[in-house]
Amino acid sequence: MPLLDIRNLTIEFKTGDEWVKAVDRVSMTLTEGEIRGLVGESGSGKSLIAKAICGVNKDNWRVTADRMRFDDIDLLRLSARERRKLVGHNVSMIFQEPQSCLDPSERVGRQLMQNIPAWTYKGRWWQRFGWRKRRAIELLHRVGIKDHKDAMRSFPYELTEGECQKVMIAIALANQPRLLIADEPTNSMEPTTQAQIFRLLTRLNQNSNTTILLISHDLQMLSQWADKINVLYCGQTVETAPSKELVTMPHHPYTQALIRAIPDFGSAMPHKSRLNTLPGAIPLLEQLPIGCRLGPRCPYAQRECIVTPRLTGAKNHLYACHFPLNMEKE
């Protein structure tokens, strides 16, 4: 049984008197212990999907789905209070810009201890004294912070961005989640720090069997760490496949464009040569094209593309394109 099963998730915003679809019929199934990647440009709806899973909705949002189940529990039928309780016990989220997510006026140790739920205590009643501090030290060691004394008495601005993100991961692990959502956890970090964070998440997945949803705009990075990747464009899923298969044999032109945009430092490039990017820009939600949303930018677009393509293909490799690429190799 899948841990998270989403079918035809749609998220709409109310702008004035009209509703605008920001996410359109996105489906996703995550199994226990899986690392799933979610990739797309800024504005493709990646963070909105994560917030919809956690139930963090605004008043001008309308979230609908044919199915949204977490471990055989229908999230759509739960009240707001029941949803918060379920998510608080089973789901954690890591946000972008960790320093802005921490309270600048509180020491890191106090913030970490405040986020350790009482129900996670498993010892005897006479051992409860100081257990949150011991648990906080254990979590800091678990995420790779060896000098816990210095980290716990520091304020967030006294730590590096990488250390703050490790603290945020420790806070996310405090409730022992079954699903960890990482929304661009290494955005604007140095490559060495990025590798440390992703190695840490992979180790947590292997040791605790924690399911991880990795959200990023970097396809090259996701292909190294995720088991399977969903590619989003303008709020729609355009391709889903195992990581290696997606990178070596993409079927959708947008996926191919993301792969070609990855710089190749192994070969020399002519001076002032153009990068392999798609022409144009991602359309506004209020001005979406008819049919395939990539149509105006797609180099392979034809007359049939005015009809919205359905997600089709094999069980492990789905694509939404009338003229898929690399089909002769299968």
UniProtKB/Swiss-Prot annotation:
InterPro entries: AAA+_ATPase (IPR003593), ABC_Ni/Peptide_Import (IPR050388), ABC_transporter-like_ATP-bd (IPR003439), Oligopep_ABC_C (IPR013563), P-loop_NTPase (IPR027417). One of its GO terms (molecular function) is ATP hydrolysis activity. Its main location: membrane. GO terms for biological process: peptide transport; potassium ion transmembrane transport; putrescine transport. It is a peripheral membrane protein. The keyword Membrane applies. Keywords: ATP-binding, Cell inner membrane, Cell membrane, Ion transport, Membrane, Nucleotide-binding, Potassium, Potassium transport, Transport. Changing residue 183 to E: About 60% stimulation of K(+) uptake by TrkH. Residues 6-259 form the ABC transporter domain. ATP binds at residues 40-47. One of its GO terms (cellular component) is membrane. It is found in: Cell inner membrane. The keyword Nucleus does not apply. Changing residue 165 to L: 60% stimulation of K(+) uptake by TrkH. It comes from the Bacteria. Disruption phenotype: Single mutation, decreased extracellular putrescine, in an sapBCDF operon deletion no change in resistance to antimicrobial peptide LL-37. Changing residue 46 to G/I/Q/R: 25% to 50% stimulation of K(+) uptake by TrkH. Part of a putrescine export transport system, does not play a role in resistance to antimicrobial peptides. Stimulates K(+)-uptake proteins TrkG and TrkH to import K(+), may act via ATP-binding rather than ATP hydrolysis. Belongs to the ABC transporter superfamily. PANTHER family: OLIGOPEPTIDE TRANSPORT ATP-BINDING PROTEIN APPD (PTHR43297), PUTRESCINE EXPORT SYSTEM ATP-BINDING PROTEIN SAPD (PTHR43297:SF4). This is Putrescine export system ATP-binding protein SapD. It comes from Escherichia coli (strain K12).
